[in-house]
């Protein structure tokens, strides 16, 4: 118990430091073209963004438009704020093409065939805690970054598998997204999108998945490395789908384990989200895979989901976003209740191999 409390203190401190170290700007930075250029140069330095001279002028114009969007939105009375993150000199179309699937239309894959068991094990759950945070319970690894690869589906899958494995074994092991990107090809398409459900099925049928340290992420699609994938570390027994368009059912599932979900993450406010409870403009055109790792309620009574993203720790609240929960639309905010699923693990048993050792535990 003492160790878990210590871990949460460290996490809380990192959240505070992350906010303190985020890139900021002020009214005086918007006063002239020269001050805006200086702001752009500071932003490039902060995020280590390299541009050719010709490209810089084009990107500067995009940056200016994004600065004004962030500035004007933050002046509004909204329960969330935006910031100039690493996407600040990308148009929203470019952002969606790379990070929210519009380039390859992989949101269509989220509507594919379902492989779940057809049952919902949490259907008869009565009451649930007022709040749950699987990070506090030690079931969530550090935030990862998918890079410029449409592999969000793999990251969403891995968060859920890492979570249920920790719940069943009391051991947190970072698992390999790259194995899914390189090797899970029956329905999934690597950096061009995929389905979390199909990834769960792949892990089940294969008998498990290897660790992050054994098969590290490269942010690009490669040939499946057969020498690594047989070193299995964690197995699952299948997966189930949460009843569609039912936030109450989703709540029951998240109260018991992290859950993979698909959302519409293509809006400008989502692109530049910084902190607070996101209530912003979005639709139900599912284009991004994430994972819900908890839920809660603000002091003013706003219900929210704690959503783990895969755009690195500088995006949002140290890589997370709080999204409004229990809205009037049955699909949930940004379609969060439309396609949720989670892995099943019936026992603490895992493959007995070279990777079943303490060295991979976090």
From Swiss-Prot:
<feature type="disulfide bond">
    <location>
        <begin position="282"/>
        <end position="334"/>
    </location>
</feature>
<keyword id="KW-0645">Protease</keyword>
<dbReference type="Pfam" id="PF00112">
    <property type="entry name" value="Peptidase_C1"/>
</dbReference>
<dbReference type="InterPro" id="IPR000668">
    <property type="entry name" value="Peptidase_C1A_C"/>
</dbReference>
<dbReference type="InterPro" id="IPR013128">
    <property type="entry name" value="Peptidase_C1A"/>
</dbReference>
<keyword id="KW-0926">Vacuole</keyword>
<comment type="function">
    <text>Thought to be involved in the hydrolysis of stored seed proteins. In vitro, catalyzes the hydrolysis of proteins, such as azocasein. Shows a preferential cleavage for Asn-|-Xaa in small molecule substrates such as Boc-Asn-|-OPHNO(2).</text>
</comment>
<dbReference type="Pfam" id="PF08246">
    <property type="entry name" value="Inhibitor_I29"/>
</dbReference>
<feature type="glycosylation site" description="N-linked (GlcNAc...) asparagine">
    <location>
        <position position="346"/>
    </location>
</feature>
<protein>
    <recommendedName>
        <fullName>Vignain</fullName>
        <ecNumber>3.4.22.-</ecNumber>
    </recommendedName>
</protein>
<comment type="similarity">
    <text>Belongs to the peptidase C1 family.</text>
</comment>
<feature type="short sequence motif" description="Prevents secretion from ER">
    <location>
        <begin position="359"/>
        <end position="362"/>
    </location>
</feature>
<keyword id="KW-0325">Glycoprotein</keyword>
<dbReference type="InterPro" id="IPR039417">
    <property type="entry name" value="Peptidase_C1A_papain-like"/>
</dbReference>
<feature type="propeptide" description="Removed in mature form">
    <location>
        <begin position="353"/>
        <end position="362"/>
    </location>
</feature>
<keyword id="KW-0378">Hydrolase</keyword>
<dbReference type="InterPro" id="IPR000169">
    <property type="entry name" value="Pept_cys_AS"/>
</dbReference>
<dbReference type="GO" id="GO:0005788">
    <property type="term" value="C:endoplasmic reticulum lumen"/>
</dbReference>
<dbReference type="GO" id="GO:0008234">
    <property type="term" value="F:cysteine-type peptidase activity"/>
</dbReference>
<feature type="glycosylation site" description="N-linked (GlcNAc...) asparagine">
    <location>
        <position position="326"/>
    </location>
</feature>
<keyword id="KW-0865">Zymogen</keyword>
<dbReference type="GO" id="GO:0005773">
    <property type="term" value="C:vacuole"/>
</dbReference>
<dbReference type="GO" id="GO:0033095">
    <property type="term" value="C:aleurone grain"/>
</dbReference>
<keyword id="KW-0788">Thiol protease</keyword>
<feature type="signal peptide">
    <location>
        <begin position="1"/>
        <end position="20"/>
    </location>
</feature>
<dbReference type="InterPro" id="IPR013201">
    <property type="entry name" value="Prot_inhib_I29"/>
</dbReference>
<dbReference type="InterPro" id="IPR025661">
    <property type="entry name" value="Pept_asp_AS"/>
</dbReference>
<dbReference type="InterPro" id="IPR025660">
    <property type="entry name" value="Pept_his_AS"/>
</dbReference>
<dbReference type="GO" id="GO:0006508">
    <property type="term" value="P:proteolysis"/>
</dbReference>
<feature type="propeptide" description="Activation peptide">
    <location>
        <begin position="21"/>
        <end position="126"/>
    </location>
</feature>
<keyword id="KW-1015">Disulfide bond</keyword>
<dbReference type="InterPro" id="IPR038765">
    <property type="entry name" value="Papain-like_cys_pep_sf"/>
</dbReference>
<feature type="disulfide bond">
    <location>
        <begin position="183"/>
        <end position="224"/>
    </location>
</feature>
<feature type="active site">
    <location>
        <position position="152"/>
    </location>
</feature>
<feature type="active site">
    <location>
        <position position="288"/>
    </location>
</feature>
<feature type="active site">
    <location>
        <position position="309"/>
    </location>
</feature>
<keyword id="KW-0732">Signal</keyword>
<keyword id="KW-0256">Endoplasmic reticulum</keyword>
<feature type="disulfide bond">
    <location>
        <begin position="149"/>
        <end position="191"/>
    </location>
</feature>
């Amino acid at each position: 118990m003492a160790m878990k409390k210590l871990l949460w203190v460290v996490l809380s401190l990192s959240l505070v430091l992350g906010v303190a170290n985020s890139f900021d700007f002020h009214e005086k930075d918007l006063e002239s073209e020269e001050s805006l250029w200086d702001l752009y140069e500071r932003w490039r330095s902060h995020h280590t963004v390299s541009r050719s001279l010709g490209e810089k002028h084009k990107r500067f114009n995009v940056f200016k438009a994004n600065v004004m969007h962030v500035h004007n939105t933050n002046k509004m009375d909204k329960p969330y704020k935006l910031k100039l993150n690493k996407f600040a000199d990308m148009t929203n179309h470019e952002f969606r093409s790379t990070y929210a699937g519009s380039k390859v239309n992989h949101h269509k894959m989220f509507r594919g065939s379902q492989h779940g068991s057809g049952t919902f094990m949490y259907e008869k759950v009565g009451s649930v805690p007022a709040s749950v945070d699987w990070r506090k319970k030690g079931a969530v690894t550090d935030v990862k970054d998918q890079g410029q690869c449409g592999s969000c589906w793999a990251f969403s899958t891995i968060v859920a598998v890492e979570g249920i494995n920790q719940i069943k074994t009391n051991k947190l092991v970072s698992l390999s997204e790259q194995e899914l990107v390189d090797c899970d090809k029956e329905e999934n398409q690597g950096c061009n999108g995929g389905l979390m459900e199909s990834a769960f099925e792949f892990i089940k049928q294969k008998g498990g998945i290897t660790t992050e340290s054994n098969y590290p992420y490269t942010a690009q699609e490669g040939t499946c490395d057969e020498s690594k994938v047989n070193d299995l570390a964690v197995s699952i027994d299948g997966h189930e789908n949460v009843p569609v368009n039912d936030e109450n059912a989703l709540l029951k599932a998240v109260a018991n384990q992290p859950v993979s979900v698909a959302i519409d993450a293509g809006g400008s406010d989502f692109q530049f989200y910084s902190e607070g409870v996101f209530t912003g403009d979005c639709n139900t055109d599912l284009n991004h895979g994430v994972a819900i790792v908890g839920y809660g309620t603000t002091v003013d009574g706003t219900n929210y989901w704690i959503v783990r993203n895969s755009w690195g720790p500088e995006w949002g609240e140290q890589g997370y976003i709080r999204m409004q929960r229990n809205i009037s639309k049955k699909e949930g905010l940004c379609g969060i209740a439309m396609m949720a699923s989670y892995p099943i693990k019936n026992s603490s048993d895992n493959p007995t191999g070279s990777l079943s050792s303490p060295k991979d535990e976090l």
